[in-house]
Curated annotation (Swiss-Prot):
GO biological-process terms attached to the record: tRNA threonylcarbamoyladenosine modification
GO molecular function, one term: N(6)-L-threonylcarbamoyladenine synthase activity
Cofactor note: Binds 1 Fe(2+) ion per subunit.
Name used for this protein in its record: tRNA N6-adenosine threonylcarbamoyltransferase
Cofactor(s) this protein requires: Fe(2+)
Pfam families given in the database record: TsaD
Name of the top EC class for this enzyme: transferase
Residues that coordinate or bind substrate: L134, V135, S136, G137, G138, D167, G180, N272
Family, per entry: Belongs to the KAE1 / TsaD family.
Length: 338
C-alpha cells in the first residue's frame, strides 16, 4: 500500500510518499521560518497563505521523487489536527480534493500521533508497549502506548509546553526566531551549574508538568544579571538543564508507574542534544532503551503523517467527504487500530 502524507498543521508544509513494503519513497519539506522571523513567531494568516502557495508544487515534487503519479497511490493522509485551523484546512482541502478526484480513500491524522509514531520510520523500531514523551512547541505530554490508537495520557503540561518555554525564554534573551534551537546553541557555551533554576512540579506527586514559572524565573534572572555573552550562555545553560531534568524526572516516575522498559521521545524538542543524552543515560541505567526519530523527522513532516495514515487506512478506517480540521483533539480519544 502506498500513501501520500500531507502535513500543514503550523508553519511547515510537508509532503511524503510511504510504501508499507519499501518504506519511505520520498519526502519534501518547506519551512516558513524566514517568513515569520520578522514577527518573532508564527502568524497564522501568513502561514495559511504560504501553505496554499507551496502545497501543490511540493506534492508534484514528492510524487516525482517517488517516480509515481497520483493514480499509483492507494490512499491519502492529511493532518486533521491539532494545529492552526487555517493551516489545517489547507491540507485537508487539498487531501480531500485529491481523494475525491481520483477515487482514493483518505484519512485525517492526529498530528501528535504522527510524532509518536515517527520512530517507526527508522530501522530500529520500538515494540509495544512503551512510554512516549511528546515534546514540541504546542504540547508536552507523557503517553502510555499499548498499540496504535491505544493511548493513555499519563501527564501533560498544565500551562506552557516545553518548546514554547524554550522559544519565549530565547525571545527574552534577544535571540532570533526560531528561538529554541538558538537558545540550545548558546547553552552549549555555558558553564553548568552557574545558576540553579527550579524543577517545576517535581516535588509533587503525579506526572503533570509546568514550564510557565520556569520562564518567569528565567526572565527575572536575565533582568538582574549582566548582559555579557558568557553570563547569557550560563543562564541559557541553566534553563536548559532545568527543562531536561524536569522531563527526565517525570519520565523516570512514569516508567516506574507503568513498568514499561522502552521510552520514545518525539516532537520538535526531541532534537535537543542535551535531552537525548540525558534520557539515553537514564534509560541505560534503568536497563531499558530509548528511541527517537532522526533530526529531520523530529520537526513537523509529511513522512510521519503518511506512516500513521497508512496504518489506519490498512485497518479500514476512512474519512467521509467532509473537510474537517480540529484545532483541539485529545490524543486519547483516537480509535484503536486492531
Amino acid at each position: 500500500m502506498r500513501v501520500l502524507g500531507i502535513e500543514t498543521s503550523c508553519d511547515e508544509t510537508g509532503i511524503a510518499v510511504y510504501d508499507d513494503e519499501k518504506g519511505l519513497l520520498s519526502h519534501a519539506l518547506y519551512s516558513q521560518v524566514k517568513l515569520h522571523a520578522d514577527y518573532g513567531g508564527v502568524v497564522p494568516e501568513l502561514a495559511s497563505r504560504d501553505h496554499v502557495r507551496k502545497i501543490v508544487p511540493l506534492i508534484r515534487q514528492a510524487l516525482a521523487d517517488a517516480d509515481m503519479t497520483i493514480e499509483d497511490l492507494d490512499g491519502i493522509a492529511y493532518t486533521k489536527g491539532p494545529g492552526l485551523i487555517g493551516a489545517l484546512l489547507v491540507g485537508a482541502c487539498v487531501g480531500r480534493a485529491l481523494a475525491f478526484s481520483w477515487d482514493k480513500p483518505a484519512i485525517g491524522v492526529h498530528h501528535m500521533e504522527g510524532h509518536l509514531l515517527a520512530p517507526m520510520l527508522e530501522d530500529d523500531v520500538p515494540e509495544f508497549p512503551f512510554l512516549a514523551l511528546l515534546v514540541s512547541g504546542g504540547h508536552s505530554m507523557l503517553v502510555g502506548v499499548e498499540g496504535i490508537g491505544r493511548y493513555t495520557v499519563l501527564g501533560e503540561s498544565v500551562d506552557d509546553a516545553a518548546g514554547e518555554a524554550f522559544d519565549k525564554t530565547a525571545k527574552l534573551m534577544g535571540l532570533d526566531y526560531p528561538g529554541g534551537p538558538r537558545l540550545s546553541k548558546l547553552a552549549a557555551k555555558g558553564v553548568p551549574n552557574s545558576y540553579r533554576f527550579p524543577r517545576p512540579m517535581t516535588d509533587k506527586p503525579g506526572l503533570n508538568m509546568s514550564f510557565s514559572g520556569l520562564k518567569t524565573f528565567a526572565a527575572n534572572t536575565i533582568a538582574a544579571e549582566p548582559k555579557d555573552e558568557q553570563t547569557r550562555a550560563n543562564i541559557a545553560c541553566a534553563f536548559e538543564e532545568a527543562v531536561v531534568d524536569t522531563l527526565g524526572i517525570k519520565c523516570k516516575r512514569a516508567l516506574k508507574q507503568t513498568g514499561y522498559k522502552n521510552l520514545v521521545i518525539a516532537g520538535g524538542v526531541s532534537a535537543n542534544t542535551r535531552l537525548r543524552a540525558s534520557l539515553s543515560e537514564m534509560m541505560q541505567g534503568l536497563g531499558g532503551k530509548v528511541y527517537y526519530p532522526r533530526g529531520e523527522f523530529c520537526t513537523d513532516n509529511g513522512a510521519m503523517i503518511a506512516y500513521a495514515g497508512l496504518q489506519r487506512l490498512k485497518a479500514g478506517q476512512v474519512e467521509d467527504l467532509a473537510v474537517k480540521g480540529q484545532p483541539r483533539w485529545p490524543l486519547d480519544t483516537l480509535e484503536p487500530v486492531d
